[in-house]
Amino acid sequence: CTGDYAGLAALRLYVVYRALVRALVAALKQRDHPRDDAAAAAFDAYFGLAVRLTAPASPFVILCHGFSGSGKSVASKALAQRIGAVRLSSDIERKRPMRDDGAFASARYTDEAIDNNYARLRMLAETTLDALCPVIVDATFLKRAHRASFIELAAGRSIPVYIATFNADLPVL
């Protein structure tokens, strides 16, 4: 994860452009080789992708909630890939502004640092939603106020918000 969420606003445009270029290449190939079924299939796939990506987007928010070790990260990674959502990870964003130095590791878990991390996640979720991309936020969300902030964000945009709660037996945690 590069952390370049601001680039999401242009991503759809460039994916559509690239799909149309690939569709054109496939069309030219089929023109030169009319019996090339693979070229026809490639054209259909790329052009279809471009059409789907120009349709109005329906973003939403999924909050992955639960204790550390309950499976949130594994599930959210798989779900994000499956549904084409942007996944925001509290673990990744928590470590991003600080050196990966043992002396500073405990500073990442103060109440202030945790609140700042949720504020950053919310800002990144706003940026992601501005780009009309669905977003999955992978964090413990143990405090009601942290969940409420994202629920308010979704409500303010009239988009759905879902909370996926993860549980695990104590020996697993």
What are these regions (language model features)?
Residues 62-64, 90:
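Hydrophobic anchor at the beta1->P-loop junction of P-loop NTPases
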Residues 67:
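P-loop (Walker A) phosphate-binding loop of NTP-binding proteins
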Residues 75, 79:
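Hydrophobic positions on the alpha1 helix immediately C-terminal to the Walker A/P-loop
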Residues 57-62, 131-133:
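Pre-Walker A (Motif I) flank of P-loop NTPase domains
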Residues 80-133:
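Conserved substrate/cofactor phosphate-moiety recognition/catalytic segment
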Residues 156-173:
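Conserved phosphate-donor/acceptor-positioning beta-strand/loop module used by diverse small-molecule
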Residues 2-54:
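Helix-rich C-terminal or lid/interface subdomains of diverse kinases
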Residues 72:
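Conserved lysine of the Walker
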